Amino acid sequence: MFLRVTTFLTALLLALPLAARAAEPLVVSVWGGNWKDTIERVVAKPFTAKTGIPVEFEVGGTIDRLAKARVAKGNPLVDVTFTTSHVGRLYISDGLYERPDMTKIPNAKEIAREAIRSPYHLGSWAYVYIVVYRPDLVKEEITRWADLWKPSLRGKIAVPDFDPSHIITIAALMEGGNESTWQKGEDRLRQLKPNIVAFYSTDAQSQDLMKTGQAPVEVMLSVNAYHLQEQGVAVKLVQPTDYPGIVGIDTMGIMAGSKRADAAYQFIDLVLSREIQSQLVESLKVGPVNGGATVPAKLRGQPGIFLTPAEWKERGYIIDDEVRAKMLPAWREWFTANIVKK
């Protein structure tokens, strides 16, 4: 009897570290607000229900979270990071991401080619920056990027100043260039300046400018435009007939040195599943990266929603991630000096 009790107690003590490890949370780094709330509700809760592993969040801005990751290199405070595709390149160049074993992410076989951003990070959803306007305040129809330069739109447009990649690339494309030869669009951008009434640096500012009518035309994130429509603001998203919308793909990566890599693989695989992708589309109004996701009829064919290879190719322009990551500081500096300043 004594031997049995001793053996049982020994086994129990040996099992404690394993149980403790099983209870350790998976830490996910993500933006705040609706992004975090949606990931928690749509992904984290089902993940915990399925695996028994709790999920905690690091919340912050894109660059702030990158800075924290750099400080914690080799002993990361988080396990999975959501960030933009081009900033993901900075994580990679700094050695902050683990190169994943794709056999551990079976749902990755179903995602669009465009969502495989590198051997280190995978797309989670897509959206576009396009022209959005209020037909009740702008009587003429806007159908092209080129319409932004019309004299009739003087003092009516808002654009982002924190990341001018979108309008810089469009201006370059209009002059026969691209993001790599962006200087070709400099003069055209200067010509746009009289039409710009405001700049924004947050989603909230962007939406407020449109709601109040201060800027009834914007280069806007499609997600924000759909949100305004849900609030009853009559905005129209333009499918430009001259150049596509500028695609954004948010991505996921596993932090190098994560002690919860196995759980991280399961989390990422769940995000890419058809069921979760369908819920993300419904909740965030983003485009799925898994073409098998269910998309509401009202969103099919709309800006930022790509379901086939042809739609990815024809209705979206993807800026080269490495060029964007490298050039963004220079673009921001030029844009501030030449467009933002009076």
Regions found by a protein language model. Name each.
Residues 86-90, 211, 216-234:
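A ligand-binding cleft/hinge motif common to bilobed small-molecule-binding domains
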Residues 23-90:
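Early extracytoplasmic/lumenal segment of secretory-pathway proteins
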Residues 130-137, 172-174, 248-263, 268, ...:
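A bilobed periplasmic-binding-protein/Venus flytrap-type ligand-binding module shared by bacterial periplasmic
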Residues 33-40, 77-214:
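Extracytoplasmic ligand-binding site segments that recognize negatively charged/polar headgroups
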Residues 6-17:
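Bacterial N-terminal signal peptides
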Residues 127, 187-192, 231-256, 301:
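Periplasmic-binding protein-like
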Residues 312-342:
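Conserved C-terminal helix/tail region of periplasmic/extracytoplasmic solute-binding proteins
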Residues 255-315:
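Mature extracytoplasmic/periplasmic domains
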